[in-house]
């Protein structure tokens, strides 16, 4: 699973929120929340940052690790 999707889903559940409640509190659409948690690859970063801000988190750019 996508690490951002996993983070949002785990923290939403830990906060005791349904997807609908999270959607309302964050002012994000329910469809977006569902797609984000399902790991959709093409989501708007501004909305991702709104979702992460609900848990006092943000996206950070870093170089990929060589495998």
Give the ranges of each region predicted by the language model.
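DNA major-groove recognition helix of helix-turn-helix/homeodomain DNA-binding modules
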Residues: 46-62
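Conserved amphipathic alpha-helical interaction elements at protein-protein interfaces in regulatory
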Residues: 10, 14, 54-57
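Residues that mark the N-terminal boundary/hinge immediately upstream of a DNA-recognition element
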Residues: 7, 18, 44-47
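Short alpha-helical DNA-recognition segment
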Residues: 17-34
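Surface-exposed charge patches
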Residues: 10, 20-21, 50
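Short, charged recognition helix plus adjacent turn
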Residues: 41-42, 60-67
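A short, Lys/Arg-rich alpha-helix, primarily the initiator
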Residues: 1-13
């Amino acid at each position: 699973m996508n690490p951002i999707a996993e983070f949002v889903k785990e923290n939403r559940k830990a906060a005791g929120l349904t997807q609908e409640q999270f959607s309302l509190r964050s002012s994000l659409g329910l469809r977006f929340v569902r797609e984000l948690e399902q790991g959709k690859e093409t989501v708007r970063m501004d909305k991702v940052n709104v979702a992460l801000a609900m848990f006092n988190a943000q996206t950070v750019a870093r170089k990929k690790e060589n495998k």
